[in-house]
Amino acid sequence: EPGAWMSTNVYDGKLRRRIERNYRWSGSAWVQTNEVRFVYDGNVALQERNEFNVPSLTLTRGMDLSGSFQGAGGIGGLLALSDHKSRILDHSYFHADGNGNVTALADTNQNVVARYLYDPFGNPLSISGPKAALNRYRFSSKPVHELSGMYDYLFRWYTPELQRWDNRDPLNEVGGIN
């Protein structure tokens, strides 16, 4: 089918997504379009790397909504994003609301270069600005998967369009965390 896509993920022993591979259907076969590798500090991502393990994006984090560095899973703790993809390292700075949702990115000259507005369930109402697409860390400071629109909350995925998680609460399931 035209526009068909597929995504595969590789997880480590702590259930952190380490590699994301995206594919598009070419009409006769699946063709890999990109690969992202994640580097973590505890349970929060600090860096994204390409398939050659070269940094493409680095996140600077501070204290999250809990007042610690990872107590709220990093929600509201994003400070800066450094884009390594161009020849000149480009920095953007996060602005978030009281719930830890990223509402804007500013450049080093304090110009707003991206704005994000969400409904209460995380559906994007408005995404604007020249660098809006660069940032995948948005609702609840979590990364959104570009093809599915789902948010990675580490132990499970959230779909704002459906206003629900893709699986039951892992703590309430018998037989494991998935």
Feature-to-residue mapping (PLM):
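Short beta-strand segments and strand-loop junctions that repeat across beta-rich extracellular domains
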Residues: 20-27, 155-160
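Acidic glycine-/aspartate-rich tracts in secreted/extracellular proteins
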Residues: 23-25, 52, 108-111, 171-173
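Surface-exposed extracellular loop regions of Gram-negative outer-membrane beta-barrel proteins
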Residues: 1-13
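Beta-strand-dense domains in secreted/periplasmic systems and polymorphic toxin scaffolds
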Residues: 1, 19-21, 48, 81, ...
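Short beta-strand-alpha-helix junction that forms the catalytic/metal-binding core
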Residues: 176-178
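Tryptophan-centered short beta-strand motifs
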Residues: 28-32, 165
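A motif-centric feature for acidic-aromatic and gly/ser/thr-rich catalytic loops and repeats
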Residues: 54-75, 79-155, 161
